[in-house]
Amino acid sequence: SEKPPALFDLTSLQREANRQLGFTAQQTLDYTQALYEKKLVTYPRTDSRYLTDDMAPLVPELVSVIQQSFQIQADVPAPVNAAQVINSKKVTDHHAIIPTKTAAGYDISSLPSGEQAILTLLAVRLICAVGTPCHYAETIVEAECAGQKFRTKGKTVTDMGWRQYAGKPVEDAEKNAEAGDLPELCLLYTS
């Protein structure tokens, strides 16, 4: 199984924004700072990937309003396991970067495209981080022929879990799983 990803701190947000969107670290910081000044995200200059214990009761409602506002698989209510993202001991000055309730009621289309992209990245990560694990079934086949050993393995997704809310990474997981699917096996010859 694959655990849900952690929430973003500034460094992990910058890495992901570079990987997915091609933004530089400075661009990501600038967009996130602008969103913070509009009260759409929490404080961006943080090194924590967790929320504080006192935020636990707020997480389910925040996830629900963010999921609806951003239309993140809105027809499938996201499961919320807030305990995965709550750990006051791992929070120093500021908790992880997350969207605020203000973001849920905001006309996101009025934002510049870079800010929209970062806000959406943060919204999707919040939904994924509190989700259930993604489960796979794996098959390994080993065979020997003419003294040569062959081995192959394939993976099939049995429960998408948090990945069903992740957008493009879901398609990648499905494509990878399909590429690794093994056909039904039958024994044709033994010596």
For every predicted segment, state its role:
Residues S1-Q33, S88, Y106-S191:
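Long, highly charged, low-complexity internal segments
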Residues D9-Q14, E37-Y43, V91-G105:
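Short acidic (Asp/Glu) and glycine-rich catalytic loops that position anionic groups and cofactors
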Residues F23-V80:
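Extended, well-ordered alpha-helical scaffold/bundle regions in very large, multi-domain proteins
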Residues L40, V80, D93, C145-G147:
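Accessory interaction regions appended to the cores of large information-processing enzymes
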Residues T42-P44, L62-V65, I98-T100, E142-E144, ...:
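Residues in well-ordered beta-strands of folded domains
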Residues T46, A56, V85, T102, ...:
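Short capping/connector residues at structural and topological boundaries
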Residues M55-L62, K89, D93, E115-I118:
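Alpha-helical structural motif
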Residues V76-T92:
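Leucine-rich, amphipathic alpha-helical/linker segments
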